Swiss-Prot record:
It comes from the Bacteria. Its EC number is 2.1.1.186. GO terms for cellular component: cytoplasm. InterPro entries: RlmM_FDX, RlmM_THUMP-like, RNA_MeTrfase_FtsJ_dom, rRNA_MeTrfase_M, SAM-dependent_MTases_sf. This is Ribosomal RNA large subunit methyltransferase M. Signal peptide: none annotated. Monomer. SUPFAM superfamilies: S-adenosyl-L-methionine-dependent methyltransferases. It comes from Shewanella sp. (strain MR-4).
Length: 361
């Protein structure tokens, strides 16, 4: 397939486009971008007929910052006849064999969501015909490729596939997280999603467990502290502002009324450092770098607030500088990931894991 279809947040098409152009070039897959403001998707059209197939196989979705989901796609199926929308889609997917799942989706915009009811109904007959054609297995199989059909408007769709080991497990790439009734703020969902994004499910018991010590810089009123407490951690919450009373009553939180940029932990056995402060992204990055160099944590999750312009360029500059500084200070083994999460707005969430191969004392 010639195209790569990428889902993103509405308003971030330019960032998603700039990123896929750079990453595709690194893999020597030439092409150009089709993107419109607030469409919530980007299409990278490759010069080679199998360029989309190459990218969906070789480009890790988790390494992309601004894409929520991606799939190799055929050309746009425009003007699908109301009398028979199924046949053109089945024909476009003729090269896909024995897929394990079908997802009929839309971009994440209010206009596209108006098609959601249609997509649910349409899934049933489409699934039946794809099974008959051999493109889809009779029973779902999580190890096989996923067929995606994304309606960008009435009678207009892209059809294609992704590999289950290089794909978001979520419909449209959006995790369905519930806001806890007792969470102090909606920002709580950001850290909940970040743990799911950056720590594989099979490693959560080891790396996000009860009894760990954690620090939350800029904690007030406690949205991120709540997620740490919920997982059984002992938390040093650092903020000049007040903390949620129910959180304090758990006995798992010690509140330090200090500036997060000046705080130094009394205990140095901290596993998790988290930080969601409204501050210039470069300044937050410098703070995390200082903590890493001092050896004050094992893993960190922090947010970088984005500027209005050159957002992709700014994020990449900060991440590249962080890697250089860590290496200059003798930290040669680390894992650095960054994602524009669903619950992020004008910010990205970064995960830094220091010396993953070494056990934590």
């Amino acid at each position: 397939m010639k195209n790569l279809f990428l889902f993103c947040r509405a308003g971030y098409e330019k960032e998603c486009a700039a990123e896929i152009q750079q990453r595709a070039a690194e893999l020597n897959v030439g092409g150009f971008v089709k993107a419109n403001n607030n469409d919530a998707y980007v299409v990278y059209q490759c010069f080679e007929e199998d360029g989309g197939d190459t990218l969906v196989k070789q480009l890790p979705l988790d390494s992309l910052i601004f894409a929520r989901q991606m799939f190799a796609a055929s050309e746009l199926l425009a003007d699908l006849p109301e009398s028979d929308r199924v046949s053109p889609i089945v024909a476009a997917l003729s090269d896909v064999s024995k897929a394990g799942e079908l997802r009929v989706e839309t971009p994440d915009t209010n206009e596209a969501k108006e098609l959601s009811a249609f997509c649910r109904k349409f899934t049933v007959p489409l699934r039946q015909h794809l099974k008959k054609s051999g493109s889809l297995l009779a029973q779902e199989n999580p190890k096989r490729p996923i067929i995606h059909v994304c309606f960008i408007g009435p009678g207009r769709a892209y059809a294609g596939y992704s590999f289950s080991n290089n794909s978001s497990p979520y419909f449209m790439g959006i995790p369905r997280l519930k806001m806890a009734a007792d969470a102090p703020s909606r920002s709580s969902l950001k850290l909940d999603e970040a743990f799911a994004q950056f720590v594989p499910k099979e490693e959560q018991e080891e790396r996000v467990r009860s009894g760990m010590n954690a620090v939350d810089l800029g904690a007030c009123p406690g949205g991120w502290t709540y997620q740490l407490v919920r997982r059984g951690m002992m938390v040093s919450a650092v903020d000049n502002g007040p903390m949620n009373e129910k959180l304090m009553e758990t006995g798992q939180v010690k509140h330090f009324r200090e500036d997060g940029f000046r705080f130094e932990p009394q205990r140095k056995n901290i596993y998790w450092l988290v930080c969601d402060m409204v501050e210039k992204p470069a300044r937050v990055a410098e703070l995390i770098e200082a903590w890493a160099i001092n050896g004050w944590f094992k893993e960190a999750i922090f947010n970088l607030k984005l500027p209005m312009k050159s957002r992709y360029k700014e994020v990449m500059a900060i991440l590249n500088t962080m890697q250089e500084i860590l290496k200059e200070n003798g930290i040669n083994e680390f894992q650095l990931q960054c994602k524009h999460l669903y619950h992020d707005r004008d910010e990205v969430t970064v995960h830094l894991w220091i010396r993953p191969s070494q056990a934590w004392n």
